[in-house]
């Protein structure tokens, strides 16, 4: 039955729950003297069996999906989640983000692309790589 269900209803429902949860922690102390929201950005690769998940090829005999997460450190609530195939490079996620003015983005060097980081700067946000 799940194969025929549209996955977008679950994505929309998840976003509604995330929005409610972030409101609950909006006033929580972060432990840092920063006025803006602090986000951590990273991804994880989930290995899958290629014979069971042929739609997610990663290597010759392996399948994988990547979960890219933008985590609001106040409350440790995901603010943005994107699923991709395992081959999709992390830096591409910066093209999907809508930068928040005054926010701080902490990310590893997989997101190091000067044009994309400059777009964060132009939006009035800050980043640490």
Model-derived segments and spans:
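Conserved, well-structured functional cores that handle cations and Mg-NTP chemistry
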Residues: 1-129
């Amino acid at each position: 039955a799940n194969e025929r269900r549209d996955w977008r209803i679950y994505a929309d429902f998840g976003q509604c729950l995330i929005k409610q949860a972030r409101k609950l922690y909006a006033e929580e102390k972060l432990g840092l003297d920063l006025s803006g929201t602090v986000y951590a950005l990273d991804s994880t690769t989930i290995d899958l069996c290629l014979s069971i998940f042929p739609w997610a090829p990663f290597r010759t005999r392996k399948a994988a999906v990547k979960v890219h997460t933008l985590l609001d450190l106040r409350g440790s609530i995901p603010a943005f989640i994107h699923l991709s195939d395992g081959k999709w490079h992390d830096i591409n996620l910066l093209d999907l983000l809508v930068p928040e003015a005054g926010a701080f983005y902490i990310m590893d060097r997989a997101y190091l692309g000067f044009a994309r980081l400059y777009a964060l700067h132009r939006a009035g946000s800050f980043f640490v790589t």
